[in-house]
Regions:
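N-terminal pre-core extensions flanking Radical SAM catalytic domains
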Residues: 1-44, 61
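Radical SAM/AdoMet-radical enzyme domain recognition
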Residues: 50-70, 78-173
Length: 173
């Protein structure tokens, strides 16, 4: 009896008719194959075309979705990453933080710098022998990451470094 109503209002506009936020994963590709990673990087789903992504983001805006969060795979391995950032910012969805393990080239750094978005660089070690064990990367990865960190530090990009400690990289040696 308590919840028995004579009339229900289905006409009044509700505050939220769509999700408040959307988590979007442009790809599940990664430059590393970390020993601690739980992501399914073996499955290669069909990626949405950039036109489909544009439609998706614009529909989210029309539905008054408040936030679109980017996750991945590695963001910089998505071929249209710059265009995606332009689109998100244009539609009012500027990401707060982009995370990567890619040793960024000067060209990528220069392009990313214009967006004024914080960058999180994942660095589990700068020792080539350790990164080869922990990340399953080639011997040049550590050298390239070291140079990328210097280049990022010399830029205007706000950044932070994240590290996952394992029994392989748990010392300062």
């Amino acid at each position: 009896e308590e919840f028995k109503f004579e009339e229900l209002d289905f006409k009044t506009t509700r505050m939220f008719l769509a999700p408040i936020s959307i988590v979007f994963m442009p790809n599940n590709n990664c430059i590393t194959d970390c020993i601690y990673c739980y992501a399914d990087t073996k499955t290669k789903p069909t990626q949405m075309s950039f036109d489909q992504i544009k439609t998706f983001v614009r529909e989210a805006k029309e539905l008054k979705v408040r936030d679109v969060m980017i996750t991945g795979g590695d963001f910089f391995m998505y071929r249209n990453w710059s265009e995606l950032l332009h689109l998100l910012i244009e539609e009012g969805y500027a990401p707060d933080l982009i995370s990567t393990k890619v040793p960024l080239s000067p060209k990528i750094i220069e392009t990313f710098e214009q967006f004024n978005i914080r960058l999180q660089i994942s660095v589990d070690s700068l020792s080539s022998s350790i990164t080869q064990k922990v990340l399953h990367v080639n011997e040049n990865y550590s050298r390239n990451m070291r140079q990328a960190l210097k280049d990022i530090n010399a830029s205007s990009i706000r950044f932070q470094v994240a590290t996952v400690l394992t029994n392989i990289n748990d010392s300062i040696k």
